[in-house]
Curated annotation (Swiss-Prot):
It comes from Gallus gallus (Chicken). It is found in: Golgi apparatus membrane. InterPro entries: Rer1. This is Protein RER1. It comes from the Eukaryota. The chain crosses the membrane at residues 41-61, 63-83, 140-160. One of its GO terms (biological process) is protein retention in ER lumen.
Amino acid sequence: MSEGDSIGESVHGKPSVVYRFFTRLGQIYQSWLDKSTPYTAVRWIVTLGLSFIYMIRVYLLQGWYIVTYALGIYHLNLFIAFLSPKVDPSLMEDSDDGPSLPTRQNEEFRPFIRRLPEFKFWHSATKGILVAMACTFFEAFNVPVFWPILVMYFIMLFCITMKRQIKHMIKYRYIPFTHGKRKYKGKEDVGKTFAS
């Protein structure tokens, strides 16, 4: 391998200015993501605010309905992945590997692990809104369409998809919404001491 053959390196073997700039930009972005991780409510409020701004923009411009429809389908897809277990119980039920321990399903504890974790769901949904917002600045994405048909398609698709997901949840007895491990409180310490 000769000098300068690796990606991002200049002729002299040092990383190029552009490569260093984008590397640093990626590090700053990742740092902000890492800092925002514990603030779930704040993250979702910001995302809802961006969504509201996007809807106002589409309403005022009276266009970009195809972009909005695509954003809705994308968010529906993310939501279904968020509600789905990482390992599909129907695939586990059909396996012919023979018996495994424990033999009764009701005795086995299986924690619910999502196919799409909450943070990745939020991150993807926010990026989707920002991309859709960027698309509204380009007239090429403003395809003329009769928007009530798109609304009806979306409502129909949402109802069919959620009905199937709820049936799956009932059949395999899992609830995707839990609040974590229960916390048990002991008796309160009133501060009194006993003299012996």
